[in-house]
UniProtKB/Swiss-Prot annotation:
One of its GO terms (biological process) is protein folding. Involved in the biogenesis of TorA. Acts on TorA before the insertion of the molybdenum cofactor and, as a result, probably favors a conformation of the apoenzyme that is competent for acquiring the cofactor. This is Chaperone protein TorD. NCBIfam families: PRK04976.1. InterPro entries: Chaperone_TorD (IPR023069), DMSO/NO3_reduct_chaperone (IPR020945), HscB_C_sf (IPR036386), TorD-like_sf (IPR036411), TorD/DmsD_chaperones (IPR050289). Its main location: cytoplasm. It holds the Pfam family Nitrate_red_del. The gene is torD. Keywords: Chaperone, Cytoplasm.
Amino acid sequence: MNKPSIDQTPANQARARVYRLLSDLFAKEIDHQRLQSLQSAEAQAFFDLLAGEPRLAPEVNIIQEVLAELGDEASLLNLAADYCGLFLVGGKQSANPYAGLYLTPEGDEEQPQLFGPQHQEMLALLKQSKLGVQSDFPEPADHISVILAYVAQQATSLDDKAQQRFIAKYLDAWLAEFAKRVSDRDPGRFYQALARLTQIWVSLDCEALGA
């Protein structure tokens, strides 16, 4: 019988769940089915658990408030429009969710370099881990959702130091600038709270892994 991995601890499983949640919320707009899941008692209990960390609580509370207010088609469409304007349409009012835009000196926020070095590096890492970008997600591999999903998978299979090195390089190094850009451009409250929550969570996690 195979012994369980030493990395399959409750703490690492909880970390993986946080990263999966963040990845899912950045991957696409919230539809009715996803909203029902996010409004469920189980999901709300998980949000409450996250809010138990004082540095995460303000952003978690905003996310919960917005989710509670999403009760009709119009409100969901408005939130979808926020997502589209921030992450799908380029230009000055967007907040492109690609690591390469922030990690390459020649990055151009209006015309980001897509499928660049960070995309290639992530593709190699995904292949090495026998993972890949889903065919129904036509985005470069350095999209924030892909990187967060990769960390979720690695949370229970890599040792702490290896995780810390990856998170520091591929997330923590650019999320502060990304979160500021989302906060400056988001016409609503949800995605700027999500971006700040992600940035703070990653920073705290990176610090804990490196301790």
